[in-house]
Amino acid sequence: MPIVTVVPAPPPVNFHNRMAVRVAALMAVMATLLFFLPYLNWLAAGFFAALLYRRRTGYLLSLESGVRLGWITGVLMFVIVTILLTATVALVTASGGFSALPPEVRNALDPRFQEAMKTLQSGPAIAELLVMLFMFITLLSMAGGALGAKLSGRGQGPVV
């Protein structure tokens, strides 16, 4: 009689999967540190989250699972970016805004930056910015997760 080994089904990729959340959180922090590369860092976070998940667990990710892992990474990145944005706006507002800065400093700032900070002083503009950030961060991270799942090595193990 042949010996049959039963391989347990890999855990689904969601917020209940501790390894998936750990990998996503690590990539979210790393991508946030690369804030000077917008769009590319969000795409890369999803991509490397899928590769790191594959490496740590040994499970191949299906395209759907890669998108889910990218989405988890994107949501965590959005939370981090929102906290940083809120802290920045609160600090600037508490110190009297940009009008409290010395004229030399105000004139040295990029005019686009000055205009953006004036815009961020209205509630609807902040809400619009947050919605756009959520869309960009999560969609690019999901695309990166799908790409990472696709390129992480087909045919080498069970697909999650």
Task: Describe each region flagged by the PLM.
Residues 92-123:
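Membrane-interface interhelical loops and short interface/amphipathic helices
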Residues 1-18, 154-160:
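Low-complexity, intrinsically disordered extramembrane tails and loops of integral membrane proteins
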Residues 27-52, 81-96, 122-152, 156:
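Selective recognition of hydrophobic, aromatic-rich stretches within alpha-helical transmembrane segments
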Residues 14-28, 120-121:
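Short hydrophobic alpha-helical membrane-embedded segments
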Residues 54-72:
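Amphipathic, cytosolic membrane-interfacial segments at TM-TM junctions
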Residues 21-25, 67, 71, 127-131:
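Hydrophobic alpha-helical transmembrane segments
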Residues 70-82:
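Selective transmembrane-helix segments that form parts of the transport pathway or gating/packing helices
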